[in-house]
Design a protein with these regions (language model features):
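N-terminal chloroplast transit peptides
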Residues: 1-38
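Rossmann-like adenosine-cofactor binding region
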Residues: 270-347, 352
Length: 376
């Protein structure tokens, strides 16, 4: 029997009015903020770099809609409306065709990108660095910035960002604290891309996920998606849920252990937009209903000393052959990676397993985003 809890028409946050105000305040920070996301700041580029980019900016600026033209930072997925995403995906399709040595492979020649990561990363950092390199740009990089940089000496994030931006034209930041990217963007003149801020947002992952859904099932309207695993700590599911509200008739299913259920702020966000969502404890029954199964790992690093809660959540929902048998032939399985044990490697060869194609799509979407942010 399926154990399912349907949302009520008037969702109430259990902690009362105070928490409601806090949640609404938090959600407001995820909406477009002209002071952070769209601005007219003058970038501090040398005149030589500006001259190098003049021709390229002239070539592409007329092609961007007003939304992408005004985009100065990429801090959360709520910045992107449907037309902006669709336009970005068209550019991503073009980026997938860029060949080494071609004219387009030199689009960002003379530009420098800094990747500043306070948390460990393989895919995201290398994806951004590969994206910049494939377009001819240069890279200055540091990983474990909190341990080996001036942050270890007590420097504030704001001071670090002001300094780093003076060395480059764009900064890609990953930080362990939710809201850190928005805080950094407020003091910067160079464009900032949020590569993940703790349990908060991961906007470029959301963009590549939406792009992958379009590629895999052929539509972005009228489909059902299940988010599975660590929904409390997974910034990818939060960002993707927000992004998908920009499309029509998308229905959400949340399948998670009790200790890592989807947080109330996202449920409220969906309710306020009239988006249907369901919580379920039955993965097989849910798999039979959906077009996209989005699995996530249980994030041990977010549990701290609560190892007993981690053990309760670990291994509860695993995608194996029985789950694949429940999926329709036209469905797909996605995962932001890395995985631990939540997807059986035996199903990797199934044509519906899209997670490695998903990772490759991230390269093209990030190439597109770098082009948009740097070539105005």
């Amino acid at each position: 029997m399926t154990a399912t809890t349907m949302r009520s028409s008037a969702f109430a946050v259990g902690a009362g009015a105070t928490n409601n105000r806090k949640i609404r305040s938090y959600l407001n920070t995820l909406s477009t903020n002209n002071n952070i996301f769209y601005n007219n700041k003058t970038r501090r580029r040398s005149s030589s770099r500006r001259r190098k980019g003049d021709e390229r900016r002239t070539m592409v600026s007329a092609k961007y809609s007003s939304g992408l033209q005004k985009l100065e930072n990429c801090v959360d997925s709520g910045q992107f409306d449907r037309p902006m995403m669709e336009e970005l995906f068209t550019i991503a399709d073009e980026m997938a065709k860029v060949k080494p040595g071609s004219k387009d492979s030199l689009l960002l020649q003379g530009y420098l990108m800094s990747t500043l990561f306070y948390e460990a990363s393989t895919r995201t950092r290398l994806s951004f660095e590969s994206a910049m390199g494939r377009l001819g740009g240069g890279i200055v990089s540091t990983e474990s910035a909190g341990e080996y940089s001036s942050a270890a000496k007590g420097e504030t994030l704001e001071d670090t960002m002001r300094t780093v931006e003076s060395y480059c034209d764009i900064v890609v930041l990953r930080h362990f604290q939710a809201g850190s990217a928005a805080k950094a963007a407020k003091v910067m003149r160079a464009p900032l891309i949020n590569a993940g801020d703790g349990p908060g947002q991961h906007p470029t992952q959301a963009l590549l996920d939406v792009y992958t859904i379009q590629k895999e099932i052929g539509r972005l309207d009228g489909f059902k998606i299940a988010f599975v695993g660590d929904l409390a700590n997974g910034r990818t599911v939060r960002s993707l849920a927000m992004a998908l509200t920009k499309f029509d008739d998308v229905e959400f299913f949340f399948v998670a252990p009790d200790v890592v259920k989807m947080k109330d702020d996202i449920k409220l966000f969906l309710d306020e937009r009239g988006v249907k969502w369901t919580e379920s404890t039955d993965l097989i029954a849910t798999a039979k209903k959906v077009d996209v199964l989005y699995q996530t790992r249980i994030q041990k690093e977010r549990f701290g000393d609560r190892l007993d809660d981690y053990e309760k959540a670990k291994g509860k929902y695993i995608i194996d052959q029985s789950v694949m048998d429940a999926l329709s032939d036209t469905a797909c399985v996605m995962h932001p990676l890395p995985r631990v044990d939540e997807i059986d490697p035996a199903v990797d060869g199934d044509k519906r397993s899209a997670y490695f194609r998903q990772a490759q799509n991230g390269l093209f979407v990030r190439m597109a985003l770098l082009k948009v942010l740097l070539l105005k």
